[in-house]
Amino acid sequence: MVFSGILPGGGSEVRMEDWKRINDRLKELAMKHMPEPGAGKTDIPGLSISRRLANDVLENSLYTPCIGVMLQGRKKSVIGTEEYVYGEGQCLVIGVDVPSSFHVVDGTKDAPFLCLSLDVDRFQLARLALEVPPSSPGASEECLRGVSVDTVDISVLDAFLRLMELLDRPEQIPVLAPMITKEIYYRMLIGPQGEFLRRFHTLGSQSMQIAQAVTWLRDNYRSPLQVEELARRVNMATSTFHRHFKEVTSLSPLQFHKRLRLFEAQRLMLSERIDAASAGLAVGYESPTQFNREYKRLFGEPPHRNITRLRNAQSGSR
């Protein structure tokens, strides 16, 4: 098997053994710095490690713009209304904040699911995109779905390795981590997912306008949704905004808004152990009845039963 890409000092083709050597080293470092199942940030700004075991319990979260490299195992995510399965050797790029339900489908104690995730600094990537010529100058301006999965380029994998190695040389992080992070952005921009990233980081593009609307919704989900006003915020006609919003997120603005609220309410009940009425009020619902109805519609059961089941499942997986 041959992977496209250029290693520093290497040729234009890299064989499987070269890819495996880099990936194996990354797995060692990931397991060293995340010794138990879980997910968390590292001392490198924006870099997180995820180590998980296979389970049937769906977890809900808000995926934020990032570049994720899968090192081992497989994961299934339902993002919007679409299902994605991805694993070792693949790169997941999130272009816009999206609510997701996910679980690991392949991960054991000896070979857990391992993933590295690098947050995308929108301003830095947008500035870099202006300096890097597009790979397809005549590319369409149509909106893209906000999620992309492709084979990871070995040059990106190698840059992630050099970034991870800094965890063992913390004194070098302040100087070298920003440089390697910028290199990862650059290599992604010139790679197979470059056009995808560029669409969400080009001022005035329809995808970036939708990303701006999504950011506003994320920051203001407790407030009532006025779609016409939100469309005006990003300089779009309401009908155009509706169409492009669904193209990017696979959800309507109203569905997206509800999902943000309900995911946060579920998180509050699970992690802060507040009751359903308080959780609904905290995320913007004025009517407990409406909150319970919409919660059951999304999660398939009333809040109390859902939270009890999730807590029992979490206890059983420990």
Q: Over which residues does each language-model region extend?
A:
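Short alpha-helical segment immediately N-terminal to, or the first helix within
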Residues: 216-220, 267-271
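Short, structured loop/turn "capping" segments at alpha-beta junctions
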Residues: 139, 174, 192-196, 224
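Amphipathic alpha-helical segments enriched in hydrophobic/aromatic residues interleaved with Lys/Arg
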Residues: 15-20, 26, 127-183, 187, ...
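A short, N-terminal "cap"/entry segment at the start of jelly-roll beta-barrel domains
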Residues: 1-43, 48, 56-57, 141-144, ...
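N-terminal regulatory/effector-sensing and dimerization cores
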Residues: 39-137
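Residue at a beta-strand N-cap/secondary-structure junction
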Residues: 76, 224, 273-274
